[in-house]
Amino acid sequence: MASPELSQFRRIVVKVGSALLVDSDKGEVRTSWLAALADDMAKLHKEGRDVLVVSSGSIALGRSRLKLPRGPLKLEESQAAAAVGQIALARIWSEVLGAHGIDAGQILVTLQDTEERRRYLNARSTIGKLLEWRAIPVINENDTVATTEIRYGDNDRLAARVATMASADLLVLLSDIDGLYDAPPKNNPNAKLIPVVDSISSEIEAVAGDAESELSRGGMRTKVEAAKIATTGGTHMLIASGKIEHPLQAIANGGRCTWFLTPANPITSRKRWIAGTLEPKGTLTIDAGAVTALRAGASLLPAGVIKVEGQFARGDAVIVRGPDTSEIGRGLIAYDADDAERIKGRSSPDVMTILGISGRAEMIHRDDLVVGG
C-alpha cells in the first residue's frame, strides 16, 4: 500500500520526546533544533492546518535546572522536578512559536483525562477553542501529579489518546529512529525499514524493540501500542526521525518513516470506537423529526428529545432511540441526566434561561454521535 503524503492531512499532532528536546550531555534544550521544528510547524499553520504538540521534557528540564545527579529519580523527586520543568517548558514553546506570531497554549493532562468522559469533553473543548483561535496547543503530561505514567512512561500512548480526542487525522511521533524495522537496526546491519503498516499484527508487535535512554522513557513497543490506539480511533500515525533539523519538512519531502494506517475513514473509525467501547449509562428517546435530522448528519438538539432515562453524567455514552423504541444510534451526552431532563423538548435559546448558564446547544454533537442504519 502506498504511503500517504503530509499535505493530505488537516489536523496534525506532533509528539516530541525528552531525548530530542533536551541535550543529554548539557541538560539544556536543543534550541537550534527546536527552532527548526517550529519553522516546520509555522509553515503548516500558515497553510491553514491545525497543529498540536504533545511535548515531553518537564522532568528532564527540571532535573537540569535543579542540578540533580544522573540516574533514576524517586517518584516524589520526579514530580518535584516536573514542577520546575513545566514552567521552563511552557516558556520555551511560547518563545519559539511566538517568533512566528503564533500563540502557544499549555494544557496539562494525564491518561485519566482522556478516559473519564467529562474530563475528556472539557479537554477537547479547550483544545478546540485554541485551534479556533489559531493558537497551537502544547500538551504535556502532568508529571507533578501523575504516578504510574511517571514510572513507566506513557507519553506515546498519551499522544495517541490526545490525537483521537482532538479528532486529528495524523499523529507524528518524532523519535531517535526513523521508523519500525523488521529487526533491531543497531544489532542487525541487514534490518529493513517497514514503510507502511496497514494492520498491527502479532508479527508487527513482535519486532517492536525497547530503544530506551535515561531521558526518554518510551521505546518502540510503546509506539506500536500508541499506533493501535491512534488507528482504532481514526488517526493515521507515523514514526520518523527527529534527530535531523526540519523533521516535518523531511517527511513532506518523502523522507524515511513508518506509516501506520487506519483501517477505514478516520471519522467512521473514530465513531466505531465510541460506539464499541463505551458502556451506555442512559437512553434518550427522540421524535421522528429528530430521527430524520440525525440520519442526515445533524447533531441532536434538546428540542427533539421526548424522553430521558438513566443516571448519567456529562460525557457518558447513551443510547438514542426513535419514537418506536428502535435504536437509532449511540453517542456522548453533553449534559448530565438532571439537566437533560430539564431541557428536553426545549429550543436552544431556552437552554440558557432554564439552566442559568450558557450551555452547549447540542444534546449530542454530531462528532460524538454514531447513527445506525
From Swiss-Prot:
Top enzyme class: transferase
Family, similarity comment: Belongs to the glutamate 5-kinase family.
Positions annotated to bind ATP: K15, S175, D176
Pfam (any one): AA_kinase
Classification via SUPFAM superfamilies: Carbamate kinase-like, PUA domain-like
GO cellular component: cytosol
Superkingdom assignment: Bacteria
Phylogenetic placement of the source organism: Bacteria, Pseudomonadati, Pseudomonadota, Alphaproteobacteria, Hyphomicrobiales
Binding site for substrate: S56, D143, N155
HAMAP family in alphabetical order: ProB
Gene3D superfamilies tied to this protein: Acetylglutamate kinase-like (3.40.1160.10), PUA domain (2.30.130.10)
Keyword field: Amino-acid biosynthesis, ATP-binding, Cytoplasm, Kinase, Nucleotide-binding, Proline biosynthesis, Transferase
Localisation: Cytoplasm
Primary role: Catalyzes the transfer of a phosphate group to glutamate to form L-glutamate 5-phosphate.
Domain PUA residue range list: 281-358
InterPro entries assigned: AceGlu_kinase-like_sf (IPR036393), Asp/Glu/Uridylate_kinase (IPR001048), G5K_ProB (IPR041739), Glu/AcGlu_kinase (IPR001057), Glu_5kinase (IPR011529), Glu_5kinase/COase_Synthase (IPR005715), Glutamate_5-kinase_CS (IPR019797), PUA (IPR002478)
Keyword ATP-binding: yes
Reaction(s) the record says it catalyses: L-glutamate + ATP = L-glutamyl 5-phosphate + ADP
Predominant location: cytoplasm
Descriptive protein name: Glutamate 5-kinase
CDD domains, A to Z: AAK_G5K_ProB (cd04242), PUA_G5K (cd21157)
PROSITE patterns documented for this protein: GLUTAMATE_5_KINASE, PUA
EC number(s) on file: 2.7.2.11
